[in-house]
Amino acid sequence: MRIQNVADDTFRRYGKVLEGYDFTELLKEMKHTPVPEDVTYVPSVEEMEALPVAKELQNKGYGGLPIEIGYCNGHNKKLNGLEYHRSSEINVAVTDLVLLIGHQQDVEKDFTYDTSKVEAFLVPAGTAIEVYATTLHYAPCHVNESGFQCVVVLPKGTNTELTFETASEGEDKLLTAKNKWLIGHEEAAIEGAFNGLKGANVGID
């Protein structure tokens, strides 16, 4: 799969590179986070949310809405699934990493999605991006054998456990956590996911 760069114009349909933030302390805090052989995701880390840049991200990035700052770390080379939220997500790449992304508009009426439409973008270490709400995304892929580390900023409560019953039809069947609609690939066998990704479980070599 051809790997593009988030600095390329082709990324502008999916999101944008963010400027004007000082992530020095946030990147330092990320040094204390584990990088497992698989993938781990923690929605909220108090130490990160206590940093001055957190208030800046809340006000500049989300117009004052309460936010959570967490991380996604590990080793991965495959798509496995695609999710979307009702809001943008801000990522800060601590290491070089690759995002496999698509457009929500390409999801069919039966909530299937053709994985041949997925595009790959390198996010260089130290780069912050906004990933638009209509951009399908999931866990990053590592570039270096030591794995990937990525800061994840979202509206508070996103990706936390559902506290209400959901229907098993329509878009509701994709809702696996608060503000998280997920389409899985059968090869990945993600627990609770609707396996609507059709085609290869694409990845990077």
Describe these PLM feature segments.
Residues 127-129, 134-138:
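Histidine-centered metal-chelating micro-motifs
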